[in-house]
Design a protein with these regions (language model features):
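Cytosolic juxtamembrane helix and N-cap/initiation of the first transmembrane helix
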Residues: 1-19
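Membrane-helix boundary connector in multi-pass membrane proteins
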Residues: 69-75, 85-88, 103-123
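Hydrophobic alpha-helical membrane segments
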Residues: 78-80, 92-109
């Protein structure tokens, strides 16, 4: 496995652990969201919204951790061509999608719904999502090269 993929796996685990902590915080005290994220409209944050946010964050955390454990899930042993690789890449792409979804969510809360301001509490998840998207897109190239080289060895 390439060094880049090992770093990406470590990054995904770290982000997953942080997300698990945010999940606990969302369930423990919903004022966490109004004080750190949705600062432009803190009155809209209630317990139900915080728990929903917590469940979403927990789901993202689990998906990201599973991808870190099995980052090659997108390259099956029987991959014969690029189409086969794409068809078997669900967990990697779902993980990538969790970061796109987080990025779109926070950007829309800031620029469309105006419930969040560009504070450090919002900038942090925006930067994590952006760096993660970039890293996972680069990781796709490494995984593709590995899959193609493994395929050549088998033939």
């Amino acid at each position: 496995m390439s060094r880049f993929l090992n770093v990406l796996r470590s990054w995904l685990v770290m982000v997953s652990v942080i997300a698990a902590g945010n999940t606990l915080q969302s369930f423990r005290d919903h004022s966490f969201l109004s004080e750190k994220l949705y600062t432009a409209s803190p009155g809209l944050v209630n317990g139900l919204q915080a728990r929903t946010f917590g469940v979403w964050t927990l789901l993202s955390s689990v998906i990201r951790c599973l991808c870190a454990i099995d980052i090659r899930n997108r390259t099956p042993d029987n991959a014969r061509d690029f189409q086969c690789i794409i068809e078997h890449s669900f967990l990697y792409y779902i993980t990538l999608f969790t970061f796109f979804l987080a990025l779109v969510h926070f950007l829309s809360e800031v620029f469309i719904y105006h419930t969040a301001a560009l504070t450090i509490g919002v900038m942090a998840p925006l930067m994590v999502a952006s760096f993660s998207i970039l890293g996972m897109l680069i990781g796709l190239q490494y995984l593709e090269v590995e899959a193609l080289s493994q395929n050549k060895k088998k033939n």
